[in-house]
C-alpha cells in the first residue's frame, strides 16, 4: 500500500513512495535505492567492530566472574545479567545485521527479522530493567528507607527474574500479533513497527504501552532514586554519619552504576526520540538514514556496561588481569584489592570498585 511518503508491504515499510517504481521488497531485493552501496558497507564495518569488541568483552566478563568466587557476590549477579544481555544482542542480533548489510537487504527473510528484532529488544530491555534494579538497590542501601538492609543472593536472583519478566512482556507481544517486527532504516535490522497504522496488528496501543511502561516508567524510577541518593550522600558527607571508607565505597559503587545509566541513555534516547517522532507524525517524510543512525548507534550499548565495569571496579580488574596472565597479576594489586574488598563487602552490598 503506497502512501504519500512511504510504502507498506506485507512485512515491511519503506520510507519512500512507490510512485517512482523503485521500491522493492527488502527481503528479496537489494535496497540500494535507499542509500549508496558504500553506506551499507560502512554499516557492515561498524557492526563488525561492535561484534569484535562486544563478544570478547561481555564473554570475558562472564568467564572471569565464573572463575573467581570473590566476584560471585549478590550485586555482581545483576552486573553479570547486564553482560548476558549484551551477549544476546551481539550473538543473535549483530550477526544477522552484518550479514544483511553486506548483502544490501534483509536476505534471511521475515522469520529471521522477527527473531532479530525480538533479541535486540529483549537484550535492551534486560539491560534497562537491570539498571532499574541497581538503582533501587543503591537507593535502599544508601538512603536507608527500610533501615539497615543487606542485598542478599535471594534479592539478586529475584531482581534478575524481574528483569527477564519485564523484558519478555516488552519483546514477546510482536511475536504473537500485538504489533510486529519489521526492517527499519536501511532495512538491514528489525524493530517494532512504529511506522504504520495497520489495524490488524494494533500497533498504536503497543507502541504507547512500550514507551510508557518500558521506557518512561523505568527512566523515571532511575532519576527519582538517584536524585534521592545524591542528596543523601551529600548529607551524610556533611554530617560525617559514616566512616570515610564506607562513604568512599558507597560513592564509588554509586558512580559506577550512574555511569552505566548514563551510557544506556546516551545509546538509547536518540532511538526512542526518533521512534516517537515517527509514531506521532505518521505520514511525514523522512529518509532511511534518519532512522538508521540512531537505531544502529543504540546497539553500542552492548559495549558500555562491561567497559565501565572494568574501568571502575578494581576488584574485577585485578581478577581479569590474573586470568589473562595465568594466575599472576602484573600490577601486583591482588593483595590490596583483597583487603579493600573485605571492607567494602561489609558496607556496600558486596561490590568493590576502587
Curated annotation (Swiss-Prot):
Keywords: Chromophore, Disulfide bond, G-protein coupled receptor, Glycoprotein, Membrane, Phosphoprotein, Photoreceptor protein, Receptor, Retinal protein, Sensory transduction, Transducer, Transmembrane, Transmembrane helix, Vision. GO terms for biological process: phototransduction; visual perception. The chain crosses the membrane at residues 40-64, 77-102, 117-136, 156-179, 206-233, 256-279, 288-312. GO terms for cellular component: membrane. Disulfide bonds join 113-190. Residues 1-39, 103-116, 180-205, 280-287 are extracellular. PROSITE patterns: G_PROTEIN_RECEP_F1_1 (PS00237), G_PROTEIN_RECEP_F1_2 (PS50262), OPSIN (PS00238). Signal peptide: none annotated. One of its GO terms (molecular function) is photoreceptor activity. It is a multi-pass membrane protein. The modification N6-(retinylidene)lysine is found at residue 299. Residues 65-76, 137-155, 234-255, 313-354 are cytoplasmic. Pfam families: 7tm_1, Rhodopsin_N. It is found in: Membrane. Visual pigments are the light-absorbing molecules that mediate vision. They consist of an apoprotein, opsin, covalently linked to cis-retinal. This fish possesses three genes for green opsin. Two (G103 and G101) that belong to the LWS/MWS group and one (RH11) that belongs to the RH2 group. This is Green-sensitive opsin-3.
Amino acid at each position: 500500500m503506497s502512501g504519500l511518503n512511504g510504502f507498506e508491504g506485507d512485512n515491511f515499510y519503506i520510507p519512500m513512495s512507490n510512485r517512482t517504481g523503485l521500491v522493492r521488497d527488502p527481503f528479496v531485493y537489494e535496497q540500494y535505492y535507499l542509500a549508496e552501496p558504500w553506506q551499507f558497507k560502512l554499516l557492515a564495518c561498524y557492526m563488525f567492530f561492535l561484534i569484535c569488541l562486544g563478544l570478547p568483552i561481555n564473554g570475558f566478563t562472564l568467564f572471569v566472574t565464573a572463575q573467581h568466587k570473590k566476584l560471585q557476590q549478590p550485586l555482581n549477579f545483576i552486573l553479570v545479567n547486564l553482560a548476558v544481555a549484551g551477549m544476546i544482542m551481539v550473538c543473535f542480533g549483530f550477526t544477522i545485521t552484518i550479514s544483511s548489510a553486506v548483502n544490501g537487504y534483509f536476505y534471511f527473510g521475515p522469520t529471521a527479522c522477527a527473531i532479530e528484532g525480538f533479541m535486540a529488544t529483549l537484550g535492551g530491555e534486560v539491560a534497562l530493567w537491570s539498571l532499574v534494579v541497581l538503582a533501587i538497590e543503591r537507593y535502599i542501601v544508601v538512603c536507608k528507607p527500610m533501615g539497615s538492609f543487606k542485598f542478599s543472593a535471594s534479592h539478586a536472583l529475584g531482581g534478575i527474574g524481574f528483569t527477564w519478566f519485564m523484558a519478555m512482556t516488552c519483546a514477546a507481544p510482536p511475536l504473537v500479533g500485538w504489533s510486529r517486527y519489521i526492517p527499519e532504516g536501511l532495512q538491514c535490522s528489525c524493530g517494532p513497527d512504529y511506522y504504520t497504522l495497520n489495524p490488524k496488528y494494533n500497533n498504536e496501543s503497543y507502541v504507547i504501552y512500550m514507551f510508557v511502561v518500558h521506557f518512561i516508567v523505568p527512566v523515571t524510577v532511575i532519576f527519582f532514586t538517584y536524585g534521592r541518593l545524591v542528596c543523601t550522600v551529600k548529607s551524610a558527607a556533611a554530617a560525617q554519619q559514616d566512616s570515610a571508607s564506607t562513604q568512599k565505597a558507597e560513592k564509588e559503587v554509586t558512580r559506577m552504576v550512574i555511569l552505566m545509566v548514563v551510557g544506556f541513555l546516551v545509546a538509547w534516547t536518540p532511538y526512542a526520540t526518533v521512534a516517537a517522532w515517527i509514531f506521532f507524525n505518521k505520514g511525514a517524510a523522512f529518509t532511511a538514514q534518519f532512522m538508521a543512525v540512531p537505531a544502529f548507534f543504540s546497539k553500542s550499548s552492548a559495549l558500555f556496561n562491561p567497559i565501565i565495569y572494568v574501568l571502575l571496579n578494581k576488584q574485577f580488574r585485578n581478577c581479569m588481569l590474573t586470568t589473562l596472565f595465568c594466575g599472576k597479576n602484573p600490577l601486583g594489586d591482588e593483595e590490596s584489592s583483597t583487603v579493600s574488598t573485605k571492607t567494602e563487602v561489609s558496607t556496600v552490598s558486596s561490590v568493590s570498585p576502587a
